[in-house]
Amino acid sequence: MDEKLSRVDPKLLELLVCPLSKGRLSYDREHNELVSEKARLAYPIRDGIPIMLVSEARRLDE
């Protein structure tokens, strides 16, 4: 994976929130996802773009 695509700008993380819980997100570098612990969802990052759709998120209990 391209190194630039595997990083998330910390300023972006400060602005983005989970669309379901409105809670903070953390970056999971191993899975390249933004994680909402509150909603127990992980949003994928594809081609450097966070996909902030609940329908595209992975449940953390899976």
From Swiss-Prot:
Under Pfam families, the record lists: Trm112p
In terms of superkingdom, the source organism counts as Bacteria
Listed Gene3D superfamilies: 2.20.25.10
GO cellular component terms listed in the entry, alphabetical order: cytosol
**What family name appears in the similarity comment?**
Belongs to the UPF0434 family.
Check the record and name the PANTHER family matching this protein. PROTEIN PREY, MITOCHONDRIAL, ZGC:162634
Name of the protein described by the UniProt record: UPF0434 protein RHECIAT_CH0004260
Q: Which species is listed as the source?
A: Rhizobium etli (strain CIAT 652)
